[in-house]
Amino acid sequence: MRHKKRGRRLSRDTSHRQAMIKNMLVSLFKHERIETTVPRAKELRPVAEKVITLGKRGDLHARRQALSILNGDKEVVHKLFTDLAERNKDRQGGYTRILKTRFRYGDCAPMSFIELVERDATSAAE
């Protein structure tokens, strides 16, 4: 029985699932909006919220933790600690939103956009 087991396996082993979440996290912060399946978006959301909170903290230890989580991508970490932290400074959580969009052709998987609530206007045009 799997009563009270948190999280979704997403048909992957642990290391593959963690790598996928980290890569999706980097893409989310880089593009500020990505399209993925609904279960993946629901798994990504709490991780993204925690990393944005690290960005708002702004100290050296938080920067090193974020660098570790974001696969060492210094460009994304810089954006997180400058742009995203500044945009979300007055928001107490709820930095992301999930918008259900369609069903994917081929396997009929439910798709959704996961995006940052305080998105940049220029990234919306992309």
Swiss-Prot record:
Q: Name one Pfam family in it.
A: Ribosomal_L17
Q: Which InterPro entries match?
A: Ribosomal_bL17, Ribosomal_bL17_CS, Ribosomal_bL17_sf
**Which stretches are transmembrane?**
none
Q: Which GO terms describe its cellular component?
A: cytosolic large ribosomal subunit
| Keyword terms | Ribonucleoprotein, Ribosomal protein
Q: Does the keyword RNA-binding apply?
A: no
Q: Which GO terms describe its molecular function?
A: structural constituent of ribosome
Q: Which domain of life is it from?
A: Bacteria
- Can the keyword Ribosomal protein be found in this entry's annotation? yes
- NCBIfam families in the record: L17
| Family (UniProt) | Belongs to the bacterial ribosomal protein bL17 family.
What is known about its subunit structure? Part of the 50S ribosomal subunit. Contacts protein L32.
Against PANTHER family, the record matches this protein to: LARGE RIBOSOMAL SUBUNIT PROTEIN BL17M, RIBOSOMAL PROTEIN L17
Q: Which protein, by its recorded name, is this?
A: Large ribosomal subunit protein bL17
Q: Which source organism?
A: Magnetococcus marinus (strain ATCC BAA-1437 / JCM 17883 / MC-1)
Tell me the classification of the organism that encodes this protein: Bacteria, Pseudomonadati, Pseudomonadota, Alphaproteobacteria, Magnetococcales
